[in-house]
A protein has these predicted regions:
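Conserved donor-binding loop and adjoining core beta-sheet/short helix segment
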Residues: 1-34, 147-175
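Short, surface-exposed connector motifs at secondary-structure boundaries
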Residues: 18-23, 88, 191-198
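Short catalytic-loop micro-motif centered on adjacent basic/acidic residues
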Residues: 27-28, 93, 198-201
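Conserved active-site alpha-helix within GNAT-family acetyltransferase domains
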Residues: 34-51, 78, 205-222
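Acyltransferase donor/substrate-recognition loop-hinge adjacent to the catalytic core
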Residues: 44-117
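Conserved catalytic-core motifs of GNAT/GCN5-like acyltransferases
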Residues: 49-58, 220-234
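Short, conserved active-site entrance elements at the starts or edges of catalytic domains
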Residues: 98, 102-151
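Aromatic (often tryptophan-rich) hydrophobic motifs at membrane interfaces
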Residues: 141-231
């Protein structure tokens, strides 16, 4: 649940009652340590949480994602420099009304090239991506696109989640354009995340390749999230 704390507190017992009425198990997904601490302060000992490493969000300092400074990110800077040297006509621009349809078509092409139709998980992910573009204005999202030879080769979509944190929901790039992922990552933060101390690039879903990629950017912290269940009452 989301909203004012007092309303959430009142809603929890109603959620429990709903689950009991319909024969379902009471579960809450994606709670952080701070959120569970608040829940436990309201209802001491009533709930328990099990954290899932695969669901942990990667939180980065926006300045470091923008500048890629330091020895640990030297390889990323090399990727950026090579990209700029290879594609001298590259360009970054914000995702707006006039390029939204073009970005949508790029996403469709990406889906076809990556076998999403034959992979249920990938297909579901692309449904979210395409719907985010369809409802881009209604959801008040922000985005950015990367062009090479005038064509969109990468794009990113996200939104602010607090005064100091911006979350990146979607990032897609053509694999045949080396460095496109690194470039859109850096450019998006530079242009769209100014004023935010942190960038949340979400979880890795337990995918080894994605985990390696996210760790390579040296996150400032991992935000653990877990599944909350009721503590079983043991009858004497």
């Amino acid at each position: 649940p989301a909203g004012p704390e007092e309303e959430i507190r009142e809603l929890i017992p109603q959620m429990e009652m709903y689950c009991e009425k319909h024969g379902g198990e009471f579960l809450m997904y994606g709670l952080s340590e701070a959120q569970f601490a608040l829940l436990d302060s309201w209802y001491p000992g009533r709930y328990q949480i099990e954290y899932d490493r695969d669901a942990a969000d990667y939180i980065y300092e926006s300045e470091k994602l923008c500048t890629l400074s330091g020895k640990k990110l030297h390889g990323k800077r090399n990727h950026i420099n090579k990209f700029k040297a290879t594609y001298e006509d590259w360009a970054y621009e914000p995702l707006e009304e006039d390029n939204l349809e073009e970005c949508f078509q790029m996403a469709l092409k990406w889906r076809n090239e990556n076998g999403c139709e034959d992979d249920e998980e990938k297909n579901c992910e692309m449904c979210v991506t395409l719907n985010s573009l369809r409802l881009f204005r209604e959801l008040h999202l922000r985005g950015g696109v990367l062009r090479v030879h005038g064509e969109i080769v990468a794009f990113t979509v996200g939104e602010p989640v607090s005064e100091d944190t911006f979350v990146v929901h979607i990032e897609k790039a053509f694999a045949e354009v080396p460095g496109a992922y690194t470039m859109i990552n850096q450019q998006f933060v530079e242009h769209e995340c100014k004023g935010y101390r942190y960038v949340n690039r979400e979880d890795d879903a337990g995918e080894e390749g994605l985990r390696k990629a996210k760790l390579s950017y040296k996150p400032a912290m991992l935000l653990e999230k877990g599944i909350v269940t009721k503590v079983l009452e043991v009858s004497e």
